[in-house]
UniProtKB/Swiss-Prot annotation:
EC category: hydrolase
GO MF, one example: cyclic-guanylate-specific phosphodiesterase activity
Ranges of residues in domain EAL: 268-520
Organism: Escherichia coli (strain K12)
UniProt-listed InterPro entries: CSS-motif_dom, Cyclic-di-GMP_PDE-like, EAL_dom, EAL_sf
Induction description: Expressed during transition into stationary phase, at both 28 and 37 degrees Celsius. Expression is RpoS dependent.
Subcellular location: Cell inner membrane
Descriptive protein name: Probable cyclic di-GMP phosphodiesterase PdeC
Catalytic reaction equation(s): 3',3'-c-di-GMP + H2O = 5'-phosphoguanylyl(3'->5')guanosine + H(+)
Function: Phosphodiesterase (PDE) that catalyzes the hydrolysis of cyclic-di-GMP (c-di-GMP) to 5'-pGpG. Cyclic-di-GMP is a second messenger which controls cell surface-associated traits in bacteria. Overexpression reduces biofilm formation.
UniProt keyword Transmembrane, yes or no: yes
Transmembrane segments: 14-34, 242-262
EC nos: 3.1.4.52
């Protein structure tokens, strides 16, 4: 599996996560939203139940206060009428009874001869408060009511009055709990004290049990608490309601993230960004192709050729990425990278081999200013390399602006660096421009060299270039030499310097230096 295929395979889970994350997040938010809403509703209902209980207790106190002001004979028709008139003004009081302790004597409706004695109260508080929960007495026969006694008067209350609240939730259940007697004194019809009892002590929490959600709220005024429950299905219903809004937002978020990811990926995988990363990670490397003096059969130097190893192992040559660097304004960065690496690779070697040189390729923009000269001077001084050991090549098509480039070339030459026109013959230079530029070397392009020993007429161009170079006193270097016949042809016409696979391919720096050390044992003209 290729590196790229592996990268794409590993990236697939990330892409899936990126697309699904906003949708999953929207589901989660919708659920939290629904849960919070149901929880708030439960706590609101519980608080309403407490408030309702507080109101009922308040009414019971008011009834007792009003009844205590009666000054006449008790359990007479007048007394009964007085009690009846009092309870008519209070919604949640069903009956009012006159009593002495737990001996109930008469109510607003009945006055038995001897009254009725009730079992001891469930709750007593000094000085005179008693509460009887779920008692079925002759005063309210057939119904289990709550009897709240203060002093001599007992308010009779329907247990449902304590906490009954209005709701659109048919599954809503509730109960009100006395924390002293540990008794539920009010329960909705469907509620079970056995179910509520283990949960009432979970203060200020919402819990899930047996398909229901439960919430409890404790009173800050009295020793009572309320618990409210609703079916878990209500949470699901709220979840679906919120999902109508949350899911489209999640899908939209997924689309936005996907588009953003595609944009970032496009930018990340763009040729410009790839080249930038290659420079930052020092992935570009230099190979060195020997330049041979075919008269002495010695290697006099090498051309530094920039290579970019691709992700799948292929090596890209400058023709593929230098135009990109020029277009994206990165060419100065490339040039500085090459110069730094040339001296890092061969600086020490050149310092100890004064008869060898390295030729560095430059772009047209490098000849628009003299910026590069100062950088080269600093490197030659740092490595103790002579200026004559560094030569520069620029392609012929770069010399379109002769007036602008001529003074820069002159500055290079005055600093001791020779300048060569690369790939001469395939561009637009004419004799006048060639004289004006005042370069040192002409390099014959490979496209002409490969036709030298064929019957094609293009070899005549090579002969013309050689004659032109001789007439101007320029050195010539033939590129792309691959056969001994080409070497002989060039030698006969006075070409002294060649490079190509016939002599050696471009090599990494360490291999090149080893090759140079073993050079005396080779016969160059045999292409070893």
């Amino acid at each position: 599996m290729s590196h790229r295929a592996r990268h794409q395979l590993l990236a697939l889970p990330g892409i899936i996560f990126l697309v699904l994350f906003p949708i999953i997040l929207s589901l989660w938010i919708a659920f939290l939203w629904a849960k919070s809403e149901v929880n708030n509703q439960l706590r609101t209902f519980a608080q309403l139940a407490l408030d309702k209980s507080e109101l009922v207790i308040r009414q019971a106190d008011l009834v007792s206060d009003a009844a205590e002001r009666y000054q006449g004979q008790v359990c007479t028709p007048a007394h009964q009428k007085r009690m009846l008139n009092i309870i008519r003004g209070y919604l949640y009081i069903n009956e009012l009874i006159y009593a002495r302790d737990n001996h109930f004597l008469c109510s607003s409706l009945i006055a038995p001869v001897n009254g009725y004695t009730i079992a001891p109260a469930d709750y007593k508080r000094e000085p005179n408060v008693s509460i009887y929960y779920y008692r079925d007495t002759p005063f309210f026969s057939g119904y289990k009511m709550t009897y709240m006694q203060r002093g001599n008067y007992v308010a009779v209350i329907n247990p449902l009055f304590w906490s009954e609240v209005m709701s659109d939730d048919p599954t809503l259940q509730w109960g009100v709990y006395d924390t002293v007697t540990k008794t539920f004194f009010s329960l909705s019809k469907e509620a079970s004290a056995a179910t509520f009892s283990p949960l009432i002590h979970l203060k200020d929490l919402t819990v899930q049990r047996n398909g229901y959600l439960y919430a409890t709220v404790y009173s800050t005024k009295r020793p009572i608490a309320a618990i409210v429950a609703t079916s878990y299905q209500r949470l699901i219903t709220h979840f679906y309601n919120h999902l109508i809004f949350a899911l489209p937002a999640g899908i939209l978020g997924s689309l936005v993230l996907l588009l953003l990811w595609l944009r970032i990926r496009q930018n990340y995988l763009s040729p410009k960004r790839k080249l930038q990363r290659a420079l930052e990670k020092h992935q570009l490397c230099l190979y060195y192709q020997p330049i041979i003096d075919i008269k002495t059969e010695k290697c006099i130097g090498a051309e530094a050729l920039l290579r970019w190893p691709g992700e799948q192992g292929q090596i890209m040559n400058p023709a593929e990425f230098i135009p990109l660097a020029e277009k994206e304004g990165m060419i100065e960065q490339i040039t500085d990278y090459v110069i730094d690496n040339v001296f890092r690779d061969l600086g020490d070697y050149l310092a100890t081999h004064a008869d060898r040189y390295v030729s560095i390729n430059l772009s047209a923009s490098d000849f628009h200013t003299s910026r590069l000269i100062a950088r080269i001077n600093q490197k030659t001084e740092q490595y103790a390399v002579r200026p004559q050991q560094i030569k520069f090549e620029v392609t012929e098509h770069a010399f379109l602006d002769v007036d602008k480039m001529t003074p820069i070339i002159l500055a290079f030459r005055q600093a001791g660096y020779e300048v060569a026109i690369d790939d001469f013959g395939i561009g637009y230079s004419n004799l006048h421009n060639l004289k004006s530029l005042n370069v040192d070397i002409l390099k014959i392009d490979k496209s002409f060299v490969e036709t030298l020993t064929t019957h094609k007429t293009s070899h005549l161009i090579a002969e013309h270039i050689i004659e032109l170079a001789h007439s101007l006193g320029l050195k010539t270097i033939a590129e792309g030499v691959e056969t001994e016949e080409q070497v002989n042809w060039l030698r006969k016409r006075g070409v002294r310097y060649c490079q190509g696979w016939f002599f050696a391919k471009a090599m990494p720096p360490q291999v090149f230096m080893q090759w140079m050390e073993q050079l005396p044992a080779r016969e160059l003209t045999r292409g070893q």
